[in-house]
Amino acid sequence: MADPQIITIPCLQDNYAFLLHDPSTGATACIDVPDAAPIQAALGAQGWTLTDILLTHHHWDHIDGVPALVEATGAKVWGAAADAHRLPPLDHALAEGDTIRIGALEGDVMDVSGHTVGHVAFHFPAATAVFTADSLMALGCGRLFEGTPAQMHGSLEKLKMLPPGTLVCSGHEYTASNARFALTIEPDNPDLIFRVERITAARAAGQPTVPSTLAEELATNPFLRADAPTVAAPLDMEGADPVDVFTRIRAQKDSF
């Protein structure tokens, strides 16, 4: 059987949407719809038919293109039941632990509240990918507009348990800025230093830095490393609860 295919689609100023395609059935899902036009262009270039739309959370820059894309394709819309009142009309309302099917591909729904309450991620083991939008991001995590630091930390702890080779398909090209901040937390982390060099080269060449891998994030993302002594020590928080360390890091990033 042919492997699932994932395409990263730049949208708006710095957003990403993703197409997930199951070659065995022809089913194709779009994860988040910042703008319909670039997604339709990508579908046309691949010769794929959109069957499903998966929404991670209610922010406008992740859902504004949904009406136009539904009108053009008739795709079914999936999203969190808890967020249904702030999402476009849903054909399938979801909660943590639910399984979704895109063709022959099964995906697990994860509650990753923090950036918003009701934010979900979609983990597709057969595609070795998790679509995290504004929860776990490349070298960062989403700003806490609605949830608490404890909620976001708990969400990230769930994501940390996925296989290290999992592709982290996050929702924005914020990686260069996140890298500059990460270096203020762990300036001597050799994995981070090497990753920043690759990020700088990719952006100079106009290439996306998303998706990353969970292994990269575990080694370099300060928001996944609140339990690491090398992260806590510069904050004078040795031995502190990782939730408190995470809270401090998030506060520093908010004013960075």
Swiss-Prot record:
GO biological process: methylglyoxal catabolic process to D-lactate via S-lactoyl-glutathione
Catalytic activity: an S-(2-hydroxyacyl)glutathione + H2O = a 2-hydroxy carboxylate + glutathione + H(+)
This protein's record includes keyword Amino-acid biosynthesis: no
A GO MF term: hydroxyacylglutathione hydrolase activity
Pathway where it operates: Secondary metabolite metabolism; methylglyoxal degradation; (R)-lactate from methylglyoxal: step 2/2
Binding site for Zn(2+) 2: D61, H62, D134, H172
Top-tier EC class: hydrolase
Cofactor notes: Binds 2 Zn(2+) ions per subunit.
Signal peptide (UniProt feature, chain positions): none
Cofactor: Zn(2+)
Chain positions recorded as Zn(2+) 1 binding sites: H57, H59, H115, D134
Keywords: Hydrolase, Metal-binding, Zinc
Matches recorded under InterPro entries: Clx_II_MBL (IPR035680), Glyoxalase_II_hydrolase (IPR050110), HAGH_C (IPR032282), Hydroxyacylglutathione_Hdrlase (IPR017782), Metallo-B-lactamas (IPR001279), RibonucZ/Hydroxyglut_hydro (IPR036866)
Keyword Oxidoreductase applies: no
Family: Belongs to the metallo-beta-lactamase superfamily. Glyoxalase II family.
Entries under PANTHER family matching the protein: HYDROXYACYLGLUTATHIONE HYDROLASE, HYDROXYACYLGLUTATHIONE HYDROLASE GLOB
Annotated function: Thiolesterase that catalyzes the hydrolysis of S-D-lactoyl-glutathione to form glutathione and D-lactic acid.
Oligomeric form and interacting partners: Monomer.
Protein name: Hydroxyacylglutathione hydrolase
Organism: Jannaschia sp. (strain CCS1)
